[in-house]
Each structure stands twice: as structure tokens, then as C-alpha cells.
Amino acid sequence: AVSKKHTILASDVFMVLFLIAGFFAFLAAKDRMAAFTGELGRRCGFAFLLLVGAAYICVAVGCSVKEWIYPVFACVSGLTYLMSILQHLEIDLFHLYASIRFDQRSMFISTFGNINIYASFLCLTIPLFMAAGMYADKCWKRVLYTVVLFFGEMAVIAANSDVAYIGIGVPMVVLLLAGIRNRVKTYDDRMVIGQKSACDPFLGWLIGCAGIVLGYTVMAFLTTGTGKGYDKLTGLAKLVDHRLILTIVSIVLVIGSLLYGWGSRKKADCVVAPKKASKSVRDKKRTTGCWKIIFWSVVGILILTAFVTVVTGANNQWEIFTFDDEWGNYRGYVWNRLFRIYQDLPFVNKVFGAGNESIYTLMSARYSDEMIEVTGTVYDSAHNEYLQYLVTMGIVGLITYLGLIISSVVNGVKLVKKDPLCMPLLAGMIGYVVQAFVNVEQPITTPFLFLFLALMAGMRRRS
């Protein structure tokens, strides 16, 4: 018999193919040394791919997820949240801003540097802790995750990056649907996600969401009340001006969590137990039907809301739906020019890419003067990881990367029904792949993605 430890998963195959695609991109590069080191970009050249590939293999084969990992990670992440909050309120404990020009300080935060990189970290960790709280097996863990989520959402305002709202919002919706779906499964007396949890995951979602909104509300009052950090806020961070709405939502979520928790306290529905004789088949069917209606109603409302938002925004020419060169802080300009560059590449480069971290070379060679005139800067990244891989590693690189992501999602979905420890990794991964549509790959938070993928592969292999 073949040991499960040595079972080859689809995600393993795609990881190897992704590394091979990176090697061919390295061969296709005009400056191979720059392609290897990534020195003309964000230091994510072929050497970086080799490192994350080696880490993936080691972790996927030899490591496993322990229950203590998430609480420790929560404490460490909480410190980075706290530092960003203090810096936002102009309290620089370690004088990290001393060597940064005053007009550039708003672009740097916490221990991560650029605000978009810190936002990427928030997109990884906040959904992770949300899921960890939903499926926590002890009350003290749920309290810890809720407190960390409270500070994490305060840090979202400090980050002042719209990326965070996108990367956190989508996993939150996914976790909401997972929590509701869990209730349907529970009343059907089937195996449920988080069957080892101390509490109902849907209740965990309510508590976590209450902590998040409450943290955002408190930070909004601190920012507007003291005036510190307010002037630099842009985009969605201007939600701090709507303090009354935030307060009402916070109160509703807190009261709703208390009422729901009190109502389900004696039911212990989160644990799959033998059928209770006192509960008739009719009652079970009725309850299951109610939760199914709630589930599909939420799905319908989300789809309808998205449709109405897009139609209304397009008709009223909202900035986010007006794609021009200035869209997304000039992301529209970069994407448009990179698509033109890709279309004009030789066939071999379309397949295998123009070389790892070659965006700076390509943009400078063709649009140097225009880029400076329009945007005022020189771009070395596509600010979209998928477009970045398409141009630098070709269609082969993009397909293998997407295959790695999709196969890892499949690993997580199959595993999460048996082991709730996988759900936080899956939620964090979703947060990252969503924010990657408008953010950059870099050697600070991108390795977390490959770590999560490797951990899920290892858990899947051992299951």
C-alpha cells in the first residue's frame, strides 16, 4: 500500500508545473540575472519561486497544523495591528517614521512598510481569525479571536487602503454562507463543518462580525474625535464619517449575537449527536427547511445587490465603474498598457513570458516618458498578480498558477468537512487571491499564500 504521506495531489502537480513555468520564463528573459534575483521588481524573481517551491514541498510533506498555531499567530498579528493603530494616532513608539520623509509617511505603516502590503496581510489574517473563531473548540479561543478581530478592523482604517475592504469582504460573505449551510446540515443530522466546535459556527460568525464592526466604529470615533490620521484617509476609509450608521450596526450585531446565543445555548446544535427522541422528524424537516430558505435568500440578496450596484454604478458613472487611466490610482493605466505590450510580444513570450519581474523593463522601454507624465512615477509591477504572471511568465505561468489555486481550494473544501482546522487556512487563502486582483506580489506576504496552500495539501494528504 502507498503511504498517504507520499500521495501526490493535484495541487502538488500544479506547484511543480508552476516552478517549471518560472524556469522557462527565466530562460526567456533578456536579462537573466535580473530575472533570477527580481532586482528590477519586487524581488520575486526565479530565486523567490525556488524558495517558495522548496518551502511548499517541505511543509506539504513534513508538517501538520496544530491547534495552538492559530492562537499564537493571533497574538503575533495582534501586535502588528496595535502598532499600526498607534502610528495612525501619531504615536510612534519605536521612532520608525524618523528616517522617512514627512510627505511619504502616509504610505508606510506598522512593521510591513507600504500600506498596500500591510493591507495584504490584513486580507490574509482577518478572515483566518474569523474562521478560527467560528470553529473554535474552547470559549477562551473565541474570546481571543474576537479581541484580535476588534483590533484588526481598527487597523483597517490605519492601513488606509481600499484593497483591505475587498480582500476581507469576500471571505466574510463566504464564511457567512458556510455558517448558514452548517445549520442546514446540522438539522439534517449529517456530518457538519466544525462538528468539534464548542459553539455553532453561525453564532461564531455573528460574534466575529460584531467584533469587527465594533472595532471599526471605535477607530472611527478616535480618528474623527482626535483629528489624528484623519487628513490622510482616502477612498473607502472615509466611512469613518458615517459614525451614526456604524454605531447602529454595531449595536444590532452585538444584541443579535447575544439573543441568538441565548436562544441556542441549550440546543448544542453544533455537535452532531444521535437523533434525539424528543425531536420529531417533522420538526427537523421544518427547521432544516427554514435554514435552507435563509441560505438561498442570502445568496439571492447578494446576487441582486451585486447586480443593482453594478447597473447603478455604470449608469451613474461612479468612479469605481469608470475604467480609464486614472482608475484605481492609475491601475487602469498600467493594466491597459501591459495588455498592449502582451499583445505585441512574440509567440514564444506569449506562451512562456517576457521574464520574471520584467514589468519595469517592458514599461520603461515603451512608455517611459508617457508613464512619468501621466502617473508621475515608474511602475515595476502590474498591481494585479494575475496580469503580472501573464506578462512575465506567459499563459503557461498563469494557467499553472490558477490550477494551483483552484486545486488547493478543492483540497480545502473536501477537507473542511472533516477537520475544521482547515477552514481558517481556506478563508485566509480566499482573502489573498481576491486582493491579488488589485495588489502586488512581494516577498513579505506572498509567502503566506504558499504556506497556506502547503499546509492544506499536507492536511489533505493525511486525511
Residue ranges and their predicted role:
Residues A1-L50, A54-C75, A132-T146, I168-F295, ...:
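Transmembrane signal-anchor hairpin modules in multi-pass inner-membrane enzymes, especially those
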Residues Q388-M393, M423-L453:
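Membrane helix-loop boundary segments at the extracytoplasmic
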Residues N114, Y330-Y379, M393-I399:
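TM-adjacent membrane-interface loops and short helices in multi-pass inner/ER membrane proteins
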Residues F121, V163-L175, L398-G403, L449:
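Transmembrane-embedded, aromatic-rich helix segments that form part
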Residues S77, L144-F150, I193-S197, D380, ...:
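Loop-to-helix entry and N-terminal half of a specific, functionally important transmembrane alpha helix
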Residues R42-R43, M83-A98, V308-S358:
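Aromatic-rich transmembrane-lumenal/periplasmic boundary elements in polytopic membrane proteins
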Residues R142, M393-P424:
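Hydrophobic transmembrane alpha-helices and their immediate junctions
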Residues F26-T37, L79-S120, F150-I157, Y165-I166, ...:
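Membrane-interfacial helix-loop-helix modules of multi-pass inner-membrane proteins that assemble, modify
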